[in-house]
């Protein structure tokens, strides 16, 4: 759940940044209403129970209601939808409006079977993309911690030039507290 909360909390910080852009024609205080976070878990048996607990704590997931067969037909995925008012930081502390965080619209798709990453991308684009018709899609792997303004800068690349079809952000290795992560040769390189 640490990897998940690191990513989700980073997204929530970015949503707060979008909403702080009061002079923007697009964003502003209600900018969170223009953002939908889609979380796709690849396999009900594979997703870590603590990640599901984190989603439940945010109000997104309800344990015990997913069934693998309905009307004698196998279920492919379970979809949960919720607008959460709280973020769960990597230390598993709740942050909400009292800390300046904005609400976040979340769609959580729990796939019944582990069918790998490309299948999850198909779910995102074919199912949710068609339903939501977004102007911009940003894909993040779990564990990626976006900087507080990173998603805004990615969005801005699309906003400034309608010919832009893709953009990539810079990835930096987390050095850890006191830069202790640098003792790991993979991080240090």
UniProtKB/Swiss-Prot annotation:
The superkingdom of the source organism is Eukaryota
Primary residence: membrane
Asked if the record carries the keyword Cell membrane, the reply is: yes
The Enzyme Commission number assigned here is: 2.4.1.16
Membrane topology annotation: Multi-pass membrane protein
Q: Where is the signal peptide?
A: none
Its BP terms in the Gene Ontology are:
cell wall organization; chitin biosynthetic process
Gene Ontology, cellular component aspect: cell septum; plasma membrane
**Transmembrane segment boundaries:** none
Catalysed reaction(s)? [(1->4)-N-acetyl-beta-D-glucosaminyl](n) + UDP-N-acetyl-alpha-D-glucosamine = [(1->4)-N-acetyl-beta-D-glucosaminyl](n+1) + UDP + H(+)
* GO terms, molecular function: chitin synthase activity
Q: Does Glycosyltransferase count among this protein's keywords?
A: yes
What UniProt keywords apply to this chain's record, in alphabetical order? Cell membrane, Cell wall biogenesis/degradation, Glycosyltransferase, Membrane, Transferase, Transmembrane
Localization: Cell membrane
Family the UniProt entry places it in = Belongs to the chitin synthase family. Class II subfamily.
Q: What does this protein do?
A: Polymerizes chitin, a structural polymer of the cell wall and septum, by transferring the sugar moiety of UDP-GlcNAc to the non-reducing end of the growing chitin polymer.
This chain belongs to the protein called: Chitin synthase 2
Output the lineage of the source organism.
Answer: Eukaryota, Fungi, Dikarya, Ascomycota, Pezizomycotina
């Amino acid at each position: 759940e640490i990897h998940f909360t690191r990513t989700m909390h980073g997204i929530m910080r970015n949503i707060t940044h979008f909403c702080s852009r009061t002079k923007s024609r697009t964003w502003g205080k209600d900018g969170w209403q223009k953002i939908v976070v889609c979380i796709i878990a690849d396999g009900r048996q594979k997703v870590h129970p603590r990640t599901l607990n984190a989603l439940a704590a945010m109000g997104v997931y309800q344990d015990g209601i997913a069934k693998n067969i309905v009307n004698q037909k196998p279920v492919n995925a379970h979809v949960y939808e919720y607008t959460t008012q709280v973020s769960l930081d990597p230390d598993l502390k709740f942050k909400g409006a009292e800390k300046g965080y904005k609400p976040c619209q979340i769609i959580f798709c729990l796939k019944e079977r582990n069918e790998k990453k490309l299948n999850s991308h198909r779910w995102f684009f074919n199912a949710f993309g068609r339903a939501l018709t977004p102007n911009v899609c940003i894909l993040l792997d779990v564990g990626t911690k976006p900087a507080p303004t990173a998603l805004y800068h990615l969005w801005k690349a699309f906003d400034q030039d309608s010919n832009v079809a893709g953009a990539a952000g810079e990835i930096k290795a987390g050095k850890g507290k006191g830069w202790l992560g640098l003792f790991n040769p993979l991080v240090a390189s």
